[in-house]
């Protein structure tokens, strides 16, 4: 059974996450894909790997996804990246980071490089999709 936590960001915004706290050790930070959540096999597999290998772990559901508050349609890469930055600063702190991003989560991982470049010791992109908007949505946007 996985114990989920919530970080209250504002009176109306909370972010659901899983953590395995370890001091002075690298953290795996798993970031899920578009319209996904923490209920799947990947977050659990990486959490179990972290526990077996004496590593810290953090995974979160971006606002509007999973059981985090908010509406999905109000989210975007920038907002979800900010959710991620906030949780990393709160949970991982100054520990080293190994990012694992699944699909869109790889894109959000890459966005974190500018904030945590001195802490990053690894990055794994699984089915990375940094250009998925072009095929799915770009042609539907207005010229404005």
Where are these regions (language model features)?
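The alpha/beta-hydrolase serine catalytic core
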Residues: 11, 107, 119-144
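Short substrate-entry loop that stabilizes the transition state in hydrolases
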Residues: 35-41
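Catalytic nucleophile-loop/oxyanion-hole region of alpha/beta-hydrolase
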Residues: 65-91
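Short beta-strand element of the alpha/beta-hydrolase
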Residues: 25-33
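N-terminal cap/lid segment of alpha/beta-hydrolase-fold proteins
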Residues: 1-23
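Conserved alpha/beta-hydrolase
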Residues: 43, 47-69
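Gly/Ala-rich beta-loop-alpha elbow adjacent to hydrolase catalytic centers
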Residues: 101-109
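Short beta-strand immediately N-terminal to the catalytic nucleophile in serine-hydrolase-like folds
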Residues: 99-101, 126
């Amino acid at each position: 059974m996985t114990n989920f936590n919530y970080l209250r960001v504002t009176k109306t915004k909370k972010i659901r996450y899983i953590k395995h706290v370890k001091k002075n050790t690298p953290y795996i930070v798993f970031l899920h894909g578009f319209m996904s959540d923490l209920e799947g096999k990947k977050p659990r597999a990486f959490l179990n790997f972290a526990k077996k290998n004496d590593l810290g772990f953090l995974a979160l559901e971006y606002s509007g996804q999973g059981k985090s508050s908010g509406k999905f349609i109000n989210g975007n890469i920038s907002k979800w990246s900010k959710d991620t930055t906030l949780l990393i600063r709160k949970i991982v702190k100054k520990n080293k980071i190994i990012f694992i991003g699944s699909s869109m989560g790889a894109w959000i991982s890459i966005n974190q490089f500018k904030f945590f470049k001195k802490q990053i010791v690894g990055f794994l992109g699984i089915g990375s999709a940094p250009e998925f908007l072009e095929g799915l949505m770009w042609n539907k946007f207005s010229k404005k």
